[in-house]
């Protein structure tokens, strides 16, 4: 995948481990701590939520580095890069757009890796 090189690839693979232990791409995002748990109190339900950061910090940092590499490489055919550009053009704050792109990156990674086991 674009943005993942000789250094970040082994880090991501090592931190994720066996991909079959996750039931979905959403579970992989939760493992990375890149999920936004719901916040509710009575009738109030928040729309502006922060990522949980309860997951693997090394994986989250490596994925953040992948997003920085994508910004530098600018691969025009990569869906994650195009998603990142779209979010930035919508006016989404820089780090929020990056974490949304990390979410998409991990879901695509999960789908491609699980194809090997089907």
Language-model segments: which ranges?
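Phosphate-backbone recognition surface of nucleic-acid-processing proteins
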Residues: 2-90, 94
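Basic, amphipathic alpha-helical segments enriched in Lys/Arg and hydrophobic/aromatic residues
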Residues: 88-118
